[in-house]
Amino acid sequence: AAEAGIRSYIETSGFANADVLARISPLTDCFLFDWKLTDPALHKTYIGVDNSLILHNLRYLAGQHKRIVLRCPIIPGVNDCTAHFEGIARLASSLDAIDHVELMAYHTMGESKKGQLGRVDSFRAEIPEQEQKQQWLSQLRALGCDARLG
């Protein structure tokens, strides 16, 4: 693909065995890497596992000098707080491979798919207004991040 000028991107939660990343890393131009929660305990509460493996894998890819877009889903009432934004900024500034931070606002586009799969999810959050998204963006930029809305 590279010989033909085709770039390869991998979207990942980062929750994978390191050997998987080691195999795909040489074939990948950029990783779209989700960073959901900075606090390990909150990550375990909402996701079911802490974020230590995810952080390890992010650092591994950065050490491979891979281009990384740190994608941060922001959910009102869950991770739209100063502590999380400060954590994102610290993480992004500590890894040269991070090209930029992409904020992704909470949405409900996957709700119908859950129903089709027979999954029931009681989680609900407010869908943020554009003004709120801009405030998040401003907050991250004030912390020194090259942040964008996704």
Regions found by a protein language model. Name each.
Residues 6, 119, 145-146:
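Short aromatic/hydrophobic-glycine micro-motifs
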Residues 125-131:
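C-terminal catalytic and target-recognition region of SAM-dependent MTase-like enzymes
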Residues 131-150:
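A cross-taxonomic marker for long C-terminal extensions/tails that follow the last structured domain
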Residues 1-109, 115:
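Conserved AdoMet/S-adenosylmethionine-binding subsite of the radical SAM
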Residues 115-123:
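Short glycine/proline- and charge-enriched loop/turn segments
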